[in-house]
């Protein structure tokens, strides 16, 4: 494993960490029981099978 040769300052560490951004989940349209909904792609199959209750949202 790589070991840093010298200590990294707190400001350098935090600015390096701040470059990371979470990606937005892409929503896909799905029609369940005649109603159109948008769900993330990973939940598409569950939505089609009726495992997600859309009335709570």
Curated annotation (Swiss-Prot):
Region (Disordered): 1-22
Signal peptide interval: none
UniProt GO molecular function: structural constituent of ribosome
UniProt xrefs under SUPFAM superfamilies: Zn-binding ribosomal proteins (SSF57829)
Record bears the keyword Zinc: no
A GO BP entry: translation
Protein keywords: Ribonucleoprotein, Ribosomal protein
Listed HAMAP family: Ribosomal_bL32
Family, similarity comment: Belongs to the bacterial ribosomal protein bL32 family.
Full protein name: Large ribosomal subunit protein bL32
Organism (species): Mycobacterium tuberculosis (strain ATCC 25177 / H37Ra)
